[in-house]
Amino acid sequence: MQTLNTLDLQTTSLKIVNGQLWILDQQALPQRQEWLLADTVASLIEHIQALRVRGAPLIGLSASLLLALLAERGLSQALLEQALIALRESRPTAVNLMNNLARMQQALLQPNWVTAMAAEALRLVDEDRELCERIAQHGAALVKPGSNLLTHCNTGGLATAGIGTAIGVLLRAHQQGNLRQVWVDETRPLLQGGRLTAWELGELGIPYQLICDSMAASLMAHGQVDAIWVGADRIAANGDVANKIGTYSLAVLAHYHRIPFYVAAPHTTHDPDCPDGAAIPIEQRAASEVTGVSGGFGHCQWAPKDTAVYNPAFDVTPAALISGWVLDSGVITPEQVAAGFFQPHR
């Protein structure tokens, strides 16, 4: 079997070269495309927490690949177990990380654990690519000709191993000739929409216009939004969804304006052990992300020094506000969710 140390693997934002894991620095985009080495647990955790590598699926994949590489380098099972624990705690909200690490932990328990971990990590990458494609196919079928769609945060190849979740839907709809344009929320405070989604859509040739988050309501009121598409960091057993802060606001606005609100995510984002949105841990981030802005363009501080800040990275959208959960298995309706689709017994 080919080992990771001899394999050249690359996605939009991850690559393995000469047995080393590299990540595309998503804090530097779109001004600079820089690849950073992530060859230790400490360095990867730092990159994850600094959002240089981000997106629920991609975080899980980067952790899995690094563990497999460390196993091939001779790290003991005991140290790999410690690495699993440390990586699991690096970001609390995205459940894909926990799900991927659970599979890597099972591989670690196998008699041939080194080869088992390499095989499992590669399997996770291949699966994610396939899951993205299925989500895109199911979602694109919901897009009517001439649609103006609105999206939030970043859900494309930068956040996955494939074409993305919500952005994958937009791509396939565009290729099928049904997409007029995309409204891109800038996504405060870290501007993932303005920096990353705008860059990705431009690279894909998809027409878009960038808006401030607060402009979405006006667009909806004037009939300029036909549907909203977002991703997810965790789906609870009752269908509640945790996603980038600002998602809940869009869902409330969509409900008021009677606009479809779709969540596109792989089944690996579902957490059957989490009963509802109230049980989802919400990461709190640094005040500096709100009092100023940083990135490939440098840093600008605009708020007074020592300003008190509340900065949750995610919010929870209640299932009652969601028109459909577009998974790799198909489009799940509110009626199916109410009947217990996401409950543990399923």
Swiss-Prot record:
One of its GO terms (molecular function) is S-methyl-5-thioribose-1-phosphate isomerase activity. Its EC number is 5.3.1.23. It catalyses: 5-(methylsulfanyl)-alpha-D-ribose 1-phosphate = 5-(methylsulfanyl)-D-ribulose 1-phosphate. The record marks 153 as: Transition state stabilizer. It is an enzyme of class 5 (isomerase). GO terms for biological process: L-methionine salvage from methylthioadenosine. It comes from the Bacteria. Pathway: Amino-acid biosynthesis; L-methionine biosynthesis via salvage pathway; L-methionine from S-methyl-5-thio-alpha-D-ribose 1-phosphate: step 1/6. Substrate binds at residues 54-56, 91, 192, 243-244. The active site is at 233 (proton donor). Keywords: Amino-acid biosynthesis, Isomerase, Methionine biosynthesis. Belongs to the eIF-2B alpha/beta/delta subunits family. MtnA subfamily. Catalyzes the interconversion of methylthioribose-1-phosphate (MTR-1-P) into methylthioribulose-1-phosphate (MTRu-1-P). This is Methylthioribose-1-phosphate isomerase. It comes from Yersinia pseudotuberculosis serotype IB (strain PB1/+). The lineage of its organism: Bacteria, Pseudomonadati, Pseudomonadota, Gammaproteobacteria, Enterobacterales. The gene is mtnA.
